Amino acid sequence: GGAVGADLAAADGALASGDGAPVVEILPVGLWLAPVRPSVCQLTVCAPGADFTTGQAMERNALIYAASTHTVVVRPRFRVGGTWTGAVDALRRRLGTLLVAGPPSDRAVATLVALGGVPLASVADMPAALMVEAPRPQPSLFGGSAVREPVLAFG
């Protein structure tokens, strides 16, 4: 994701794994405002000097879901904020597999799982969760290709 918190920790963990796999961050700000991370490919849809805005963060979240086979959602709040909105939108449009981290008793976690997310109670569950395939998009009634809505721009 490229934002502070869980996004930054995930990128740092991927770098620390030492397997040489590329690490990509999709930033919610312009490249001029992001700290330079030489081992990371940083992408943004923002102008180079653009500050953080909620709309740009929402657009960035939609791109992350659309580009990923699996996405981990951490600490969703029930019906509040960009994490919730992006997760529900990704589930509705079947954009990859959504892994939902948190206690099953949490209302937001339970709801996202009920909507099709995969529960991720602990890090130990990650290998099994990554084996879960995303639901296939519904075939079109008129041409054989899959129905897939465009990624929405929130900015």
Please identify what each model-predicted range represents.
Residues 1-155:
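Glycine-biased, small-residue-rich flexible motifs in mid-sequence functional cores and linkers
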